[in-house]
């Protein structure tokens, strides 16, 4: 079929041409668009417009991919092979762990539609992208920091701890890290923190997708364990429904007791300094510098 001439293609039904050159995105033979433009059928003109629109979208996506790979490309050209993107998910929720992911993509990796997980609202699309990343990545790993750790060392440092665990979980040692906004502590690998990195680096975007989808699945499992709180729907974030059920049903073991709405539900002072609050909740809590994975 790929050797069909333009004349032969014009003998096909327009529905077949649509399936081949729009739905399946088969490369368009030279001269086909011009032949469709000259075809007296209105449907042929509409098909030519759809093919051109698809081609323009493909060009734009290709340009977006190249732009998202500029940090990786610079490092590849310097001789680095294994570049890991690192990102986290779940800093703001009132419940559940904070989860981080690290992803090492092969040189020249492309995945249509891959972007910062916050920009991809369709959960099924995120899952599809996550499966493609896991399938094609050189290596990937996730790490987490539990609620107790969040309350002991604060959410910022717990997020860093989850990131470090993700990097340490990789099956290959990365040559360089690209990290969303921060740098990973206690890590000897050279690294670069990129503000809004999940929107500027393909590797970080991949890690963002893995962290988000992994955490969402874990929250769905917690929803089965703690029914009635809507955890599968709001993922622990402080939605009006979550705040209401927190007041009505009380605090769960998976709620972050260092977060103001949870402290309020427990009847604890919401304005306590972190050190005083941690002393209240965890009398024997280790110092921040003593925290280990």
Swiss-Prot record:
GO molecular function terms listed in the Swiss-Prot or TrEMBL record: manganese ion binding; RNA binding; RNA-DNA hybrid ribonuclease activity
Sorted UniProt keywords: Cytoplasm, Endonuclease, Hydrolase, Manganese, Metal-binding, Nuclease
Domain spans labelled RNase H type-2: 81-271
Key word Nuclease present: yes
Domain of life: Bacteria
Catalytic function, reaction form: Endonucleolytic cleavage to 5'-phosphomonoester
One of the GO biological process terms: mismatch repair
A Pfam family it matches: RNase_HII
Family indicated by similarity: Belongs to the RNase HII family.
Name of the protein in its database record: Ribonuclease HII
Organismal lineage: Bacteria, Pseudomonadati, Myxococcota, Myxococcia, Myxococcales
